[in-house]
From Swiss-Prot:
Protein's pathway: Cofactor biosynthesis; coenzyme F420 biosynthesis
Top EC class of this enzyme: transferase
Organism annotation: Mycobacterium sp. (strain KMS)
Name used for this protein in its record: Phosphoenolpyruvate guanylyltransferase
Superkingdom of the source species: Bacteria
Length: 218
């Protein structure tokens, strides 16, 4: 299995902040319910976040925006900054609102922002480093997920992030002017929504915390 951090990724995150939005663990990844009991699902979601933050933190400063105390504690333990999610209950677009709040918080000191999904357990720091380097050549860009419909990462260099995560987000980001990056970064594209996604990521190789949480051999 691959580890949570890279095999010596060259730092490329100067002037870049990574922001990750995480909902309450009890409400996250409900499509994994067929294979995990509620408490076990929360454990897996938290493990995926830890592996994602660990990989990202090897490249750039990370801010996690969340209302969940356990997610906040885990992020702080990895050296990430934590922002209490200001999104009110019942907000029609909670994920993008949380990302905009995190963007506003980091823009005071960092000109460039990457919005990263928090469920990328196979992510390698080298992949994120290479994607950031590619993104520097244009103001706004994104990396699609392995299905081609979602977005794993959105990059904004000197311009507003304008996140449009949600159903068909790849097309929504494309229509908003973001350029799709086509590099070979499999771990950056394997976000987890369904049991099939998790199986595919495990075949690719997940980080140590996710491997432990799902009972995979390490």
């Amino acid at each position: 299995m691959r580890g949570t951090t890279s095999n010596g990724a060259a730092p490329s995150g100067a002037g870049v902040a990574v922001v990750i939005a995480v909902k309450r663990l009890a409400d996250a990844k409900t499509r994994l319910a067929p294979i995990f009991a509620p408490h076990d699902r929360e454990t897996v979601v938290l493990a995926m976040l830890v592996d994602t933050v660990a990989a990202a933190a090897a490249v750039a400063a990370v801010t996690v925006v969340t209302p969940d105390p356990a997610a906040a504690e885990a992020a702080r333990a990895l050296g990430a900054q934590v922002l209490d999610d200001p999104t009110p209950a019942g907000h029609p677009d909670p994920l993008n609102n949380a990302l905009r709040a995190a963007e506003a918080a980091v823009r005071a000191t960092v000109p460039n922002v990457v919005a990263l999904q928090g469920d990328l357990p196979a992510l390698q720091a080298q992949e994120l480093s290479e994607a950031i380097a590619a993104a520097r050549t244009r103001p706004r860009s994104f990396v699609g997920d392995r299905h081609g419909t979602g977005t794993s990462a959105l990059f904004a260099f000197g311009v507003p992030l304008d996140p449009r995560f949600g159903p068909d987000s790849a097309e929504r980001h494309r229509r908003s002017g973001a350029v799709e990056l086509t590099g070979s970064w499999p771990g950056l594209r394997y976000d987890i929504d369904t049991p099939d996604d998790l199986l595919a990521a495990r075949r690719l190789g997940v980080g140590t915390q996710t491997a432990r949480a799902v009972g995979a051999e390490r």
